[in-house]
């Protein structure tokens, strides 16, 4: 049935909000636009409105979605437009890899279309656009850290995967993120890197002048170790993100005068030695005899070492630990590398 009418029929009901000036928009406008684009998703954490016309033309709105773990990650949710005409939702050759975790829209007539991947990656405008978007994301996060610290802390658990991945995969973003990335202890207290360093360096500096960052990955399983550290006056970080083994390695490279130790990787007096060890109480023969005694009753199908060592005056008589380096290396190997984390 055909009906004559002089009214236009609206086919696309989603208004291109990115073409409007940020000053003309309210929070509600941004949230409604997000719901129109992604009706089944939870509200985003933050958003960024992009608007630049020199040395390239770019408009857009990018949203930070909630990311709880790698199972909730979805790539390719950024829609690319050219003068409001949809082009693709695969922008991994246009924006840095970690930014493909964001949602939203970017619109630019300066991004070449129908060209090879290698040409796209070498195009000067694409490089400038990529760098600009990374800078705006870092600017937004730093602004929230400076002016809305409480809001950042409240949403940190949903942001940390994104920020850690960005720091691990993009050097420029990493340098910026060192100012606003947060550390968290089991009590739910948050610190910047500088704040935490100042809080622990007096008590947690070892005899070699290295600041020791103690951390736990499971507060229940490692409860007794956490309490043992606290009884010595030490603080413990909670690092339970799936990328944290890689992240810790990155931080140790950035802060060369520090080291990270999981709180259950040794006796607490050995994790932060304050003075040179005294001579062992047992002779080598006595230590070997004690080791053989334990090996005789331990399971045969596990790899382990039995050693007799000085666990300190207040240490437990027997301690089961996992070597920090070997455990961390195994965790990183099992993950298969940072770039494989999100299916690259």
Task: Pin down the residues of each PLM region.
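Conserved GHKL (Bergerat-fold) ATPase module
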Residues: 1-344
